[in-house]
Swiss-Prot record:
It comes from Salinispora tropica (strain ATCC BAA-916 / DSM 44818 / JCM 13857 / NBRC 105044 / CNB-440). This is ATP synthase subunit alpha. Residues 534-550 have a biased composition (Basic and acidic residues). It is an enzyme of class 7 (translocase). The lineage of its organism: Bacteria, Bacillati, Actinomycetota, Actinomycetes, Micromonosporales. It is found in: Cell membrane.
Length: 550
């Protein structure tokens, strides 16, 4: 029988090999507990290493974002259904800061405030994630606004032009056409998109905050019908969403846009509207027990909007030359632009377009108040032909409004004042525009030139709309080269002479047709018994149509 021997060296070697190959699978996890919850807010105790804006996960899988970092607890805004969150539940850190997925696949899609698709068209492949709380480009990364962003709206492109990288506020009471102005601007980018030229193309983002779901659906329908959805992303946070989603939606849209801007592309983003975002932020702040300030808004409500709108910029050539143009919308009460939120946003932006209820009700649409609307930086980006023809337009309209108010009390006016009133009424009529019908820049230049130079003074006010549409049609058929020259930025004596000749020829046709309609109609038959004493005449007057007299 063999003798059993124990080798201590072998045992020691085996133990050393085992110890050296051993790795402890230990994971460290911070866990907190819900102290109280309600109204979409949870206060969590524990989790001492939590970062601001870090995502936290509750027991049922619901996500929340840490906004308040107090000594004893964390104030968390729940992003989702908070009905299942109860006191005592466990909460754990994710280590991820609030961010949104980005990429070209978002064009043509509708997403929520977290960048998740809600249009039923499946998942969206992303090119990465971008934090919602990103710093705006610094001073050295920017350059002056020098490229125009055409809205297709005559009154805006002529008097308050917008440049790529500008922040232009659209402000007014409810139901004054604010959203329509923004949508017209999106629709007007269609030809640029279809040109295929990256320098011309503008990607659009429409952020809907606190609107009815049916309204958002109708806006999507308008964009689809016009063929504009292919270059547009809708970030929707309807009225039914919790306040946290409404507060975050504009930042999500901005993050998607910044991804394209830093890629050297041009972006247009519409925030519709920031009044509702401020109200949602107020609700969240009060529930988090932050001290209220003016109108119960928290002290940092200015920073809420400034850090959002400062992301809109025109980047320098070294940074790729991309841009993000912002059109924030603010709703006023009784045309009061001196309220807290309107004055905040006016001071942040580069100009404002003020829409007035009285003008809207008078049929002046878009209802732009020329006196209070201004563009501080867009003038340097305005196309040269428009800059040359629209110089006196704002002054003419301002003088017209002043004279109009005076004429209401004055019984008689001198000839010059009457002429100014006549021209002003035609300019107002000329700047009217139907919904969702943006004008190409060359058409705008021709019409503004005709109005400012008095070429429409002998056209009846009621016929201005028909005259402009028929005249543009006439130019496209007979003088297409002139329109092409204007579109290319050419404006000089030769172009003016061609337009002079064209409008003179067309007015003969137009006014001749008017005379034919009015003068060559059969005389009215006299009533029975009045054959011997009634005379019916027909005549034409340049300014007005007078009734038949006896």
């Amino acid at each position: 029988m063999a003798e059993l021997t124990i080798s201590t060296e072998e045992i020691r070697g085996a133990l050393e090999r085992y110890v050296s190959s051993y790795s402890a699978d230990v994971s460290r996890e911070e866990v907190g507990t819900v102290a109280d919850a309600g109204d979409g807010i949870a206060h969590v105790e524990g989790l001492p290493s939590t970062m601001t804006n870090e995502l936290l996960e509750f027991e049922d899988g619901t996500i929340g974002v840490a906004l308040n970092l107090d000594v004893r607890e964390i104030g968390v805004v729940v992003l989702g259904d908070f009905a299942g969150i109860e006191e005592g539940q466990r909460v754990k850190r994710t280590g991820r800061v609030l961010s949104a997925p980005v990429g070209d696949a978002f064009l043509g899609r509708v997403v929520n405030a977290l960048g998740e698709p809600i249009d039923g068209l499946g998942d969206i492949p992303n090119e990465g994630f971008r934090e919602l709380e990103l710093q705006a480009p610094n001073v050295m990364s920017r350059k002056s606004v020098d490229e125009p962003l055409q809205t297709g709206i005559k009154a805006i492109d002529a008097m308050t032009p917008i440049g790529r990288g500008q922040r232009q506020l659209i402000i007014g009471d409810r139901k004054t056409g604010k959203t329509t102005v923004a949508l017209d601007t999106i629709l007007n980018q269609r030809d640029n998109w279809r040109s295929g030229d990256p320098k011309k193309q503008v990607r659009c983002i429409y952020v809907a905050v606190g609107q009815k779901a049916s309204t958002i659906a109708s806006i999507k329908g308008v964009l689809e019908e016009a063929g504009a959805m292919e270059y547009t992303t809708i970030v929707a946070s309807p009225a039914s969403d919790p306040a946290g989603f409404k507060y975050l939606a504009p930042y999500t849209g901005s993050s998607i846009g910044q991804h394209w801007m830093y890629g050297g592309k041009h972006v247009l983003i519409v925030f519709d509207d920031l009044s509702k975002q401020a109200e949602a932020y107020r609700a969240v702040s009060l529930l988090l027990r932050r001290p209220p300030g003016r109108e119960a808004y928290p002290g940092d409500v200015f920073y809420l909007h400034s850090r959002l709108l400062e992301r809109c910029a025109k980047l320098s050539d070294e940074m790729g030359g991309g841009s993000m143009t912002g059109l924030p919308i603010i709703e006023t009460k009784a045309n009061d632009i001196s309220a807290f939120i309107p004055t905040n946003v006016i001071s942040i932006t580069d100009g404002q377009i003020f829409l007035e209820t009285d003008l809207f009700n008078q049929g002046v649409r878009p209802a732009i108040n020329v006196g209070t609307s201004v563009s501080r930086v867009g003038g340097s980006a305005q196309v040269k032909p428009m800059k040359k023809v629209s110089g006196s337009l704002r002054l003419n309209l301002a003088q017209y409004r002043e004279l109009e108010a005076f004429a209401a009390f004055a019984s008689d006016l001198d000839k010059a004042s009457r002429a100014q009133l006549e021209r002003g009424s035609r300019l107002v009529e000329l700047l009217k525009q139907p919904n969702y019908t943006p004008f190409p820049v060359q058409d705008q230049v021709v019409l503004v030139w005709a109005g400012v130079e008095g070429k429409l003074d002998d056209i009846p006010v009621g016929e201005i709309g028909r005259f402009e549409s028929e005249f543009l049609q006439y130019l496209r058929h007979k003088h297409e080269g002139v329109l092409a020259q204007i579109a290319g930025g050419t404006w000089g004596d030769e172009v003016i002479a061609s337009l002079d000749a064209a409008i003179s020829d067309f007015k003969k046709l137009f006014l001749g047709k008017e005379d034919e309609l009015r003068i060559n109609e059969p005389a009215a038959e006299p009533l029975a018994g009045e054959e011997d004493r009634e005379t019916v005449t027909r005549f034409h007057d340049d300014a007005t149509d007078r009734p038949a007299g006896s």
